[in-house]
């Protein structure tokens, strides 16, 4: 459950280390985002010579949450951190590698690139 002002780790090699959610996209008064939802973020920590700079505003897709994902069979998949993958304006990943596991809930037409780059899909 990601909301405004939530800090997330970045799970790709775009150069950002930490981002902060500034808006949950989709709906006029939408409060929370879960795995697979697109949010607007600002970069709070970045490495030198990365593709993104501190203070930059971008879109991101949530790939891991501490709250977890409930599956139709009743199982629950939780993670140790909240993480996101940065997207460009065409909603394609900025980085070329994904770090850590991602869930099958991303397996839509929009995020197949993230699924294929991920080392582990739960």
From Swiss-Prot:
<comment type="function">
    <text>Binds to 23S rRNA. Forms part of two intersubunit bridges in the 70S ribosome.</text>
</comment>
<keyword id="KW-0694">RNA-binding</keyword>
<dbReference type="GO" id="GO:0070180">
    <property type="term" value="F:large ribosomal subunit rRNA binding"/>
</dbReference>
<protein>
    <recommendedName>
        <fullName>Large ribosomal subunit protein uL14</fullName>
    </recommendedName>
</protein>
<dbReference type="InterPro" id="IPR000218">
    <property type="entry name" value="Ribosomal_uL14"/>
</dbReference>
<dbReference type="GO" id="GO:0006412">
    <property type="term" value="P:translation"/>
</dbReference>
<keyword id="KW-0699">rRNA-binding</keyword>
<dbReference type="GO" id="GO:0022625">
    <property type="term" value="C:cytosolic large ribosomal subunit"/>
</dbReference>
<dbReference type="Pfam" id="PF00238">
    <property type="entry name" value="Ribosomal_L14"/>
</dbReference>
<dbReference type="InterPro" id="IPR005745">
    <property type="entry name" value="Ribosomal_uL14_bac-type"/>
</dbReference>
<dbReference type="GO" id="GO:0003735">
    <property type="term" value="F:structural constituent of ribosome"/>
</dbReference>
<comment type="similarity">
    <text>Belongs to the universal ribosomal protein uL14 family.</text>
</comment>
<dbReference type="InterPro" id="IPR036853">
    <property type="entry name" value="Ribosomal_uL14_sf"/>
</dbReference>
<keyword id="KW-0689">Ribosomal protein</keyword>
<dbReference type="InterPro" id="IPR019972">
    <property type="entry name" value="Ribosomal_uL14_CS"/>
</dbReference>
<comment type="subunit">
    <text>Part of the 50S ribosomal subunit. Forms a cluster with proteins L3 and L19. In the 70S ribosome, L14 and L19 interact and together make contacts with the 16S rRNA in bridges B5 and B8.</text>
</comment>
<keyword id="KW-0687">Ribonucleoprotein</keyword>
């Amino acid at each position: 459950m990601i909301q405004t002002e939530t800090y997330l780790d970045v799970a790709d090699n775009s150069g950002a280390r930490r981002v902060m959610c500034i808006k949950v996209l989709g709906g006029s008064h939408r409060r929370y985002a879960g795995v697979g939802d697109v949010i607007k973020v600002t970069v709070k920590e970045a490495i030198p010579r990365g593709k993104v700079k501190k203070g930059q505003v971008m879109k991101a897709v949530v790939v891991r949450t501490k709250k977890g994902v409930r599956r139709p069979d009743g199982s629950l998949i939780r993670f140790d951190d909240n993480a996101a993958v940065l997207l460009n304006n065409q909603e394609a990943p900025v980085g070329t590698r994904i770090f850590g596991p991602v869930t099958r809930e991303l397996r839509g037409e929009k995020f197949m690139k993230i699924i294929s780059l991920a080392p582990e899909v739960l």
